[in-house]
Swiss-Prot record:
One matching Pfam family: Ribosomal_L25p
Family the UniProt entry places it in: Belongs to the bacterial ribosomal protein bL25 family. CTC subfamily.
Keyword Ribonucleoprotein: yes
Functional summary from the UniProt entry: This is one of the proteins that binds to the 5S RNA in the ribosome where it forms part of the central protuberance.
Protein name: Large ribosomal subunit protein bL25
Cellular component per GO, a single term: cytosolic large ribosomal subunit
Single GO biological process annotation from the record: translation
Disordered as annotated region, ranges: 185-205
Subunit details: Part of the 50S ribosomal subunit; part of the 5S rRNA/L5/L18/L25 subcomplex. Contacts the 5S rRNA. Binds to the 5S rRNA independently of L5 and L18.
Amino acid composition bias (Low complexity), ranges on this chain: 186-205
């Protein structure tokens, strides 16, 4: 995914405000052997790019002054109540160095899972992304979670997923976290309990 930016020579609160008023967003690219570089981007193009999932979890081709660098989106700051991107950070990546990135999960075959189709349950997404470690060339845009065989009451764990080649999940202490489950809707559980209580009542003499 290509991102076009321009070198920025001035900094400070006043300069950033003037930049935003002209339809630009200040930013920075850092990391690697090169020095951090101040940049500016077209605000509207950046705003639309931020709505794309791939912009957050892909290696970007960041073009600055005609030169292209591989980079990751690392952070962005939004205005508290206006639809305005205040600042954006990119990190350079090297083809030979592993990176840590959060990758979104795509849940597949939810409607056809036995626990949903036959058991009338709901699929619960316990996590929606996973932090992974891999080389830039191995970074997936997303990881598939196939829940098509899940039964009512079943939980899918990390060990049940088929990870792309070269990708390792960073679990931060929990070696096999839960990813998804299928359970009955809360209302259905309450109705079933009430029905059981009513059936067990003995009419007064």
């Amino acid at each position: 995914m290509k991102v076009v930016a321009f070198e920025r020579s001035v900094q400070g609160t006043g300069a950033s405000r003037r930049l935003r008023n002209s339809g630009k967003t200040p930013g920075i690219i850092y990391g690697g052997a090169a020095e951090p570089k101040m940049i500016e981007l077209d605000h509207n193009a950046l705003w639309h790019a931020l709505k794309k999932e791939a912009f957050h979890s892909s290696i970007l081709d960041l073009e600055v002054a005609g030169k292209s660098e591989k980079a990751l989106l690392r952070a962005f700051q939004m205005h508290p109540f206006k639809p305005l991107v205040l600042h954006v950070d990119f990190q350079r990546v090297s083809a030979n160095d592993k990176i840590h990135v959060k990758v979104p999960l795509h849940f597949m075959n939810q409607e056809t899972a036995p626990g949903v189709k036959l058991g009338h349950g709901l699929v619960n997404h316990i996590v929606n992304d996973l932090e992974v470690s891999c080389l830039p060339a191995d970074l997936p845009e997303f990881i598939e979670v196939d829940v098509g065989a899940m039964e009512l009451g079943q939980t899918l764990h990390l060990s049940d997923l088929k990870l792309p080649k070269g990708v390792t999940v960073i679990t931060h202490g929990d070696d096999n976290p839960a990813i998804a489950s299928i359970s009955q809707p809360a209302g259905a559980v309450s109705e079933a309990a009430e029905g059981g209580e009513a059936a067990g009542e003995t009419p007064a003499a």
